[in-house]
Amino acid sequence: MNIKEYIKQWAESYKTDLTENIMPFWMEHGWDKVNGGVYTCLDRDGSLIDSTKSVWFQGRFAFICAYAYNNVEKNPMWLEAAKSTLDFIEKHCFDENGRMYFSVTAEGKPLRMRRYVFSETFAAIAMSEYALATGEQKYAERALQIFKDTQRFLTTPGILAPKFEESVQLQSHSIIMILINVASCIRKVINDPKLTEQIDESIAKLKKYFIHPEFKCLLETVGMNGEFVDTCMGRTINPGHCIETSWFVLDVAKQRGWDKEITDMALQIFDWSWDWGWDKQYGGIINFRDCRNLPVQDYSQDMKFWWPQTETIIASLYAYLATGDDEYIYKHQRISEWTYAHFPDAEFGEWYGYLHRDGTVAQPAKGNLFKGPFHIPRMMIKAYSLCQEILNKEV
């Protein structure tokens, strides 16, 4: 394989697919030019099947529009859509205490509040990316404010409803990993010691509590001191989630001059998670595994969702950038060939989200409250940038 040519071809493919397929699909079918914001509950052909708006995706869509503008093409429509969606967020998606809703109506009336803070994290990265695109410092300051509010919600007893009764003392991987990415995004536009502290704290927790060498995995749920919890929940491995974490950590390692300890930790997470996640029979990254190889409780455990594949594409390129090891190019080739053979919809555009284990389509909708314009375009933008970095490094 001529790696340089391989990377060049993928760079062009990511840019073309993003600008001619993915972004136009959501600009035409998702962006609400009447109320602002974005619809994500779309059928295969882009027609609206539910006008409920996911607040996660208000932030995610605004982020993607600004992220594409900053890294791929200075398309003014993308910036306009980002601004429209940020305005919708500010007008409709916060309650009087600064908490964000999970879903709202088309016009922005509140529908549901949930006990976690993912809406806040996505709004924060949207504000920071828009600040980077426009130079408007007020958005950077707003991003930092939302981030600090999120930290307060997580650490102040009584603000967030507990997931379990007091007798159950567990901690989850998801919020710890996402805050690495949120803080990394905001640090691009504003300096505050809380951001670096959060990154350091999250990485330390992953290393101390969630990485379990006895199973060669990163667990989703552990005890408060990292104890292995021998239940269905405690044994769960989410390979796609762990692989996403690996590239978030590689991002930090790169920012710190390829800090060896952090780089090695990220590569270990990726390598282990690939081994758990790659389906040797059918290909692709599987949803869930049990660290003791017992039956997995989640009913979607053997399905192939869109986002673990996109995160693996990013992580394999990032691992190659970090190491120059051809093994990661071959992993990129394997995941890319499988993903692009099964997920894209050649007739109506965009990608399917949910496949059976063998790669057949489970349901054809292009979006819902959890799938929309985020993982796929983020992959294309990040992978395009990584390809450029790899090519520049090899010159």
Task: Label the predicted regions.
Residues 1-395:
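Glycan-recognition and catalytic cores of secretory/periplasmic carbohydrate-active enzymes
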